[in-house]
């Protein structure tokens, strides 16, 4: 049985499409292992932080107004939780912080929620690109280890988390401030002596 060139092409493209998922899964698993190995936090602390982010977001979204009108992300580093996103008013902003504080394991809350409409998917994509650029610049800069700083971008604002020296914090902020599209850099560091 011979296959027409069009059928051969369809088979090849289908195979590539299905294998692409395997490649992404394999690379993702490798990236996760590398992250655990290079992050200064222990693997247990990293898992605790991921769990805490999930618990805080769940607790906050139990509020109907937040769930319907807000967009909130929780970012945790050593139990210190940063709230970012958009809410309709200051009352909802305060409610979100109060709900987050009530979650077991939360040591500190940094409420950086902004009052206004939810950002667009296009802005979310721009923020992801900003985060990628900041991390890449840190890798080549050398003044601060990129693995020591967690970088999150939200609506053009870059948030830097981690446990670093004052010099490293300043270097990280300097690097982030020079990236196109960055409106503001917010340091949420715990400082070493």
Predicted feature locations:
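N-terminal targeting leaders
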Residues: 2-7, 13-193
């Amino acid at each position: 049985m011979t296959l027409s060139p069009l059928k051969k092409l369809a088979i090849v493209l289908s195979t590539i499409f299905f294998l692409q998922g395997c490649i992404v899964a394999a690379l993702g698993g490798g990236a996760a292992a590398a992250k655990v190995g290079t992050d200064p936090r222990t693997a247990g602390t990293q898992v605790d932080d991921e769990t805490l982010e999930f618990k805080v977001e769940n607790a906050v979204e139990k509020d109907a107004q937040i769930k319907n009108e807000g967009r909130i992300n929780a970012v945790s580093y050593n139990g210190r939780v940063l709230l970012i996103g958009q809410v309709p008013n200051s009352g909802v902003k305060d409610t979100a912080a109060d709900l987050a504080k009530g979650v077991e394991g939360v040591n500190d809350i940094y409420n950086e929620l902004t009052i206004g409409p939810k950002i667009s998917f296009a802005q979310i994509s721009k923020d992801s690109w900003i985060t990628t650029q900041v991390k890449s610049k840190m890798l080549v800069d050398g003044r601060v280890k990129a693995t020591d700083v967690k970088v999150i971008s939200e609506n053009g604002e870059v948030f830097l988390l981690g446990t670093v020296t004052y010099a490293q914090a300043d270097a990280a902020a300097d690097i982030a401030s020079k990236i196109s599209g960055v409106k503001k850099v917010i340091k949420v560091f715990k400082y070493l002596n």
